[in-house]
Amino acid sequence: MNDRLNTIVDLKRYPIHDLNSTIIKNLVKKCKEELDQYSCSTIPNFILPKSLEVMNSELEKQLDEVYMSKESINAYLYAKDDPSLPDKHPKRNFMERYNGYLNSDCFPKNSEMKYLYETEELLKFVSACLGISPIYRWADPLACHAYNVMEPDGILPWHFDSCEFTLSLMIQKPEKGGIFEYCPNIRAPGNENFNEVKKVLEGDRSRVRQLKLEPGDLQIFKGRFTLHRVTKVEGQKSRYMCIPAYVLDPYSCLLYTSPSPRDRG
């Protein structure tokens, strides 16, 4: 283990460098159970406060590189209507998205997040929590550990991910709003469950769970079959999330909820 990892991750609480430790075995078991039941697991205060300050500073130095965009999309990440479907079909329900991305290549090679992302310790720990092996670092130099930036009034509407799983690290939370909401396993392979999806899109909250992330928290999430969103950011502070991307195929092309200068998705 490189000594630098010890300055980024709270290894006393989460010794991810030792997957055979009782602490990590219990944590992995907990994460697997939560992912199986809710498609979501959170590890609080994973990042040390001083490292969090470094990450925040590195991001804010590059804010002029953030690509912000607005568009109207449906829950399936498409912006084009399909008039062949019934008027009330969930694929014809379009919602406002306003957010931006800061590409991975905006950061120096020795940046805090780049170092953490490239450690074997984090990759193997995430693989254990997911119960999936092998997983890989994404070969895309622009998006492998990009930041999702949501300025005041930023919003991510209800949607499904195009990938099996995602990681998120909360770097800065807004003064109000910016809450992660999700409906676990609302659809399944071979069953889109359009009626239940339609209910959620129209305001039914009977299946909705909320997750109030704090800076330093690590979230592991399976979003392909779980409808989810981030509520509107309120106040003066932006919401910063880093999205370290581990994938089943390092050369895959993923569909994102917003484009970048390279026209993602």
Report the location of each language-model feature.
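Fe(II)/2-oxoglutarate
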Residues: M1-D36
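Short amphipathic
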Residues: S41-F46
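Signature of the catalytic double-stranded beta-helix
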Residues: I47-K50, V54-V66, S84-D140
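Catalytic core of non-heme Fe(II) oxygenases with the double-stranded beta-helix
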Residues: C106-K114, L123-L218
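Short beta-strand His + acidic residue motifs that chelate non-heme Fe in jelly-roll/DSBH
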Residues: L156, L227-E234
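A short hydrophobic beta-strand segment most commonly corresponding to one strand
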Residues: S168, Q236-P250
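Conserved small/polar residues in nucleotide/adenosyl-binding loops
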Residues: Y256-G265
